[in-house]
């Protein structure tokens, strides 16, 4: 439609909407809105819409396919509305039906959307019984009888779709349809048409069957020659008239459709196959019998020809099977094999296979194939079972899986048909179950699931159950690596685990429930229990065996240990006993091992008589002691009355000791030595079974050692000891430990023999190095040849063996054997510090075991171990070879444990030795920060064997020694006080607490724990001050380390050393006073650490200080008596240091430092003051700012307290503090604290300090800022500094800037340096100046100067460079230009500081809300900002106003424009409210301000004149009516004159004039308003549409004000209101918030003038109190309707006025106009609709539909047109 065409009807509008949709078809938002609008119109005027769509399609024959589809979709949506069906005109519907059929016939094969849209129209109409006959008639018109050419493909599909959606509507026409179809089908040649006809016929058949289901009728006819007709696959038959009605026609159709199976198109073949299947349910049974061969032989090959159509083919076959299997009449047997072969590949698909992505059709086909087997099984179950069993023998996994899954499905789904096939299934599955490991895991898992199904249906019995058992047992374990490598397939670990779990569960189920379980499983399972391959499933086998024995015992039967045990594959009793005991290894470690041990123990107890008749008694200890112990150790939380939670390693060690004790008891009760030797031999043979299981092998070595200790045959012992060395993998730590501990167990009974053999083992290494003629010695070595690396590990094992042999030595011979034999032998190895790490670790462990073995608490007496220092030297040598930061082995941990054990021996270490060993340990341990991965497991192994059970050797010794050794290091999480108030730190030994090495997070933590034990033992052995000073000297350098872990470790060790010294000090005498030398150094370095970032360091530092002061008190001769004056540790912590793991709050930090400073001042001797201050100065540069701040505070307290004694050093002290300011600038608090000391000195040199600070560059550095702040806090300095500053600032403002030539005739104002400097200083000193009274006296002058500064520099800038030749230092730096942006920003900062100082927070808040601080920097907005500031002072600080105004009076007549401007700003700001000091009205001040503004109306400055008009406008808000009445006329005249100000080129004064008039009209009498009203209304009307949004907002506001004053009595204004109401409504949703708000306020104030109650109610509800509506669109919808109903005579005026805005420059206003138009014209009565100028309005809306700028305009126009549905 052309843009100039006139639009006058709804039909034209609908045509325009359709044109819009087709034009902007790619804009989905527009297209969707048009569709929604058409839907709305269609719901009200469906016939008009349908007529329009009909005409549109006819008038636009060249419209594109997608566009025509949209129109048809619109029709479909309209007629699909059930509410409008009754309104539809039947003639129009007939036109639409014909149109749709014509459109459908016009489509081509590629126009899918167009054709489907046409079909959707017809189908939608056909769903309704009213139109279905018309639709089908129209379709049949396109399909006349006798036609040899097929109708359009979509005509056929339409009939098919109607059959699906309305079968009852189509079936009455089906005879006619089929009568036309039958002769036509043979002429259908194209594949798409054949597909369509096949689909249609399928739908017809389904419709007939659905009608039978919904409306069953008795047969009115009987089949000729047939007695029944299949009705379902279940075999029920009924005579159904409906099918019989169409049997002849369907047979004719069947003949033609069947021929389509031979089509070349795969889709056609698939559709034809499904259709043939459906027809099989419709044709006569006799015809089906005749065509069985034909159907099968033609449908089966389709799978190969039409792969993608498999689902349709399968559906056809399923329907055919339903018809054929209903009874025995159909001869299907000869073809069953072919059918199953065709269906089976579809059943072989695995929907659960994640490696293959199956389509939805493939999954449906899979399910349909299963259904086919279900249907066929109702008649041919035995044939199907044979078939599936045969398929299971196929080599392809998919075939096997398919057969297994189908069989399982049949067992579960059609069990009644499979009951008589039990023997057939059992025999048929034997071969599958007996197959070797050539079957894939997936197939095996499927077989296991089949076995479960067989068991569920009681198919597993004595007849063929052994095959099932053999299969399950065989698949309990996966293939070996060799087998997997031979197959060259990737091992599916997850699948193997699932298979193993399924097999184990199936075996247990059989053992627990099957009646013949004993016959099947006993002793068959014993063949596998000792097989290496079955090691991972020993627990499962034991569980089954134990269950069998338990069932036999419960049944009162005895186990048969004879029958079947002659089988060589069945393991013997000794082998089983050894295997079961090995299964106890590491049982408490995890659930799997616990379950294995539990089952093994239960089996030992159950079959104990089999092992030996005398073993039944000891075997009972399993349930009496060991099983309860296992339950206790396996729990992670101990009970309340039990021992504390134990460690994993200690749990395992305790468990292993208990198991070995049980083993020893079991062996001991057997008197026959041969039995013992047989058991040891069996253990030796099983060592090779655990090549890959080091833990189990290690435990078995220990078991073998315990067993050999009970054997007296020496040669047998020697042979098996050699076997232990031969079998152990010495490169594995656990096996080395197991071998060594096993040898130690043997040594308890064969000490001399073991020592001799160990020496022989040591010679193997030397024999290996021999060559030449001595090479024959290699052949005589009793074990295999070791390479170099293995020989190294063998040496490590040998070293460990000696350590455990020493532990096994009897107490009466240990010292002699140690000195004469063992040490002499080991010294040759110990002396070589260059050996490999593994050997050094073993030697350190051996040293520790030796020291433990000869500990005085163990052997008694005062025997001295002369080689102790020698061993310590070896340990130091080993440590020195390590890298401090990098932890790569357990050597340091073992060195600490060795040191802790050695230093406990006599004689005590010398000071030099203490320093030496302490330095080496600390240097190598404290810096540790990284560790090698895998050390955690390594540590666990070490702790299990090397630590856990060692102390049990002398556990019966005095408790004091045990506690001394086991005391853990300190932590921050456990704080308490002892009897004397001394802090005690202990690790929690309760639930979940860390206790020992192997429960530490890392081996690094375990190493630190052992390091602490070593230091503790050093102090306990030499508890003197000298020892403490040596150790503290080593630890002090680590207090200030940056690394957290180093500080933590250093203070932890410090506390540990001090605490142990306090407990054991020997150099303290009662009554003898002496200085505790470490006191000053410790206090100076630890006191600042009280506020360390780490809570742990804080608490430990306080603990160290407490211990230090306690020790100092002891050294005064008081002994360990309580010092009543010493602070309480817990009280100090609770009061100052309780902050959890986060850092302390600032106030708490200060209080803590103050408290500790007072304590230090009281307790630190003057003789140690110099050392204390030196330490404090070192701490000022600590890496942690909080700590350096604390040091500065301590320095301040020290200077204040003892300044009299430091007079001579005062200058040097202050100089150093100033120098430190630059070093500690990163720490603000430290600066502050150092400056606190500086202020005390600055009082005497105040002038010099000020002069220096004045010359500092701007902006001031943090140091200078802090200095000014400190100076201003001094009460003597503050007033003097203020007076000096104000005098200098006032003088500098006479010439605040200079004009700089920028080139090109352009100059710039550059601010001078002096005003900036003084303002910057003023901003600093007013922050915290004291006293406040001095500031308040000078407050008016300060404010005046700052406001003057802003007015003076508002349009200036900072100098970019310094003047040439200037010798003054550079003050205005680039940093200042970046920070302050503009010079006025410096005054803003000063004002803010002043307000903060005077606690005028509300003034700041007022400025923030108005964003006035930012406006102060803008040359156009600073006046408004100052106004906000002054008015806030009037409200919040009225006492400041009068002095400020008085100070400004002398500026009023100044020649300087900034001074006059400042005076006018103050005067204008005080018009609204002028107050006295007490906050009351000050008329005198107000009059002065008004006169000042009146006098300034003629000022040369435009901004001053503008400000005067604005200020006089504020007179409306004055509280004095007298003053208002005196000056309102003058103010109004001033505002009116402002409208015609000749210098006002940008309407700025005009805007202020309108604003002023807006405020003054309410104060003017009616006569005066009436006199100015015409002029104001004339002036204001054009302002509504001005580009300036501020002017628009002011105009709307003034219009509202005028109306509220004179509108009620002025018809002239009422007329203007109706004229302008459209503008108000449209701008209510203006682009700018201010305009929107003013419109809302004006409408709210003027609604009474409309004299419409409904309008008033609506406005009061939606625009309550002048607020904007919550939803503009909803408000306009309601209000427009009210306007139309209230003023029907003006409705056309409103519509035309609104249409004028269709061409607005604002897209939002155009949107609003369209929306308002739609709402105004919605729902009008017919008479009112007749008054509307349709052509203008409708044409405008159509033009908006084509808006090219904004899509929202087109959407709004579309929505508006939807509301015009009644304009038809």
From Swiss-Prot:
InterPro entries xrefs: ARM-like (IPR011989), ARM-type_fold (IPR016024), HEAT_Maestro (IPR055406), HEAT_MROH2B-like (IPR055408), Maestro-like_HEAT (IPR048465), Maestro_heat-like_prot (IPR045206)
Subunit structure: Homooligomer; homooligomerizes at lysosome scission sites.
GO MF annotations, alphabetized: membrane destabilizing activity
PANTHER family associated with the record: MAESTRO HEAT-LIKE REPEAT FAMILY MEMBER 1 (PTHR23120:SF0), MAESTRO-RELATED HEAT DOMAIN-CONTAINING (PTHR23120)
Pfam family, one: HEAT_MROH2B_C
Protein's UniProt name: Maestro heat-like repeat-containing protein family member 1 homolog
GO terms (BP aspect): lysosome fission
Gene name of the encoded protein: hpo-27
Record keyword Repeat present: yes
Alphabetically ordered keywords of this record: Lysosome, Membrane, Repeat
Species the sequence originates in: Caenorhabditis elegans
Subcellular location as annotated: Lysosome membrane
SUPFAM superfamilies, alphabetized: ARM repeat
GO CC list: cytoplasm; lysosomal membrane
